[in-house]
Amino acid sequence: MSRPVIGIASYRDRARWNIWDTDATVLQQGYVDGVHRAGGRAVVLPPDDTDADVLARLDGLLLPGGADIDPARYGAARHAQTDTPSADRDAGELLLLDAALAAGLPVLGVCRGLQLLALAYGGTLHQHLPDLVGHNGHCPAEGVFGEHPVHLVPGSLAAAVYGERTVVNSHHHQAVLDPGALHVTGRADDGVVEAAEDPSLPFVLGVQWHPEVFGDPELFAAFVAACAARSLQGAASSR
């Protein structure tokens, strides 16, 4: 059986290696490794080529973490702690996401990816969690991961992967405020949304933590399995 083909959104940033210091298409290797180890084939989607017709060649879409989403997308003024927006990245990833949802493709959103899912479903974000929860445990410092338990709703996709409680890493200062039409299926002890999904579709799941950082084979395995099922469905319908 051929491996399912999974598109992973990337972004443009400044990068340095050897003698070079230049703009580059960037994606953390952990996402590619997670897909490959679970039996999928990862395809990196360039940030400046987000025509939705590429989805016809894919069996799933993964939206990775990254910089804050432009608050204008959900009708808010920019908080002093919010990153400088990347309008092109926001627009491109939301275009891909909307098309993937319309096509019924499996979608996994990680950190920023969960937040994009919330916006696609009509939700909003909180721009700086310390203002809301009174601590910085979700992002102790730049490049330093926090760790905390997450409680998951029985019967959800997330609970099928982890059980009803798991401990996750954490590196975010923003979070879903209103999930829109998404169903919240995981929260931290302080109430912060940590997982959300669309139960009307086979696999649409966003998580606020980073499964690509320390290795999280269970989540990647569940996602790739859903993509493989989608691939088989497509092969059967084309006969």
What role is predicted for each listed range?
Residues 1-108, 119-121, 126, 130-159, ...:
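N-terminal beta1-alpha1 cap of cysteine-dependent amidohydrolase-like domains
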Residues 111:
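Conserved G/P- and acidic residue-centered "switch" motifs that form tight phosphate/ATP-binding loops
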Residues 205-209:
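Active-site-proximal beta-strand elements of phosphoester/diester hydrolases
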